[in-house]
Amino acid sequence: MEVILKQDVEKLGHQGDVVKVAEGYGRNYLLPKKLAIEATAANKAVIEQMKAAAVRRIAREKTDAESLAKQFDGVTVTFTRRAGESNQLFGSVTTSDIATELEHKGFKLDRRKLSLVEPIKTTGDFKVALKLHRDVTVDIPVHVAKEAEVAAQ
């Protein structure tokens, strides 16, 4: 089944793309959630108009994302956690923790925009990618320290 995406769908395509999907995926997920429409000749003409508007919107969003990215310069997120002798954390630091800490610093964002392959389970310095726009990604430094080390300082 061919569908036209009405908005970006992760791992499938961007708004306005004509993609081939399984019948069930199209009829049971994409169409009911209004993420896509069937690829007919009439719909393709409508999508061309939507693409023109989308190009302007995407340019504006990219500009906004770039200005927001500049605000993240010099921002470091620091966590103190209990850890064992081998610097293994009792627990972990997740994207949710990082998003909450960034919110305390005045940045309101969705935790799903943070890219962390797996939760941080050791002390040290890490980089977490924050995807503000499909063309704008910022690396945020994350420092995880042992509770005893912080108390000693």
UniProtKB/Swiss-Prot annotation:
GO terms for cellular component: ribonucleoprotein complex; ribosome. InterPro entries: Ribosomal_bL9 (IPR000244), Ribosomal_bL9/RNase_H1_N (IPR009027), Ribosomal_bL9_bac/chp (IPR020594), Ribosomal_bL9_C (IPR020069), Ribosomal_bL9_C_sf (IPR036791), Ribosomal_bL9_N (IPR020070), Ribosomal_bL9_N_sf (IPR036935). The keyword rRNA-binding applies. One of its GO terms (biological process) is translation. Keywords: Ribonucleoprotein, Ribosomal protein, RNA-binding, rRNA-binding. PANTHER family: 50S RIBOSOMAL PROTEIN L9. Belongs to the bacterial ribosomal protein bL9 family. This is Large ribosomal subunit protein bL9. It comes from Koribacter versatilis (strain Ellin345). The lineage of its organism: Bacteria, Pseudomonadati, Acidobacteriota, Terriglobia, Terriglobales.
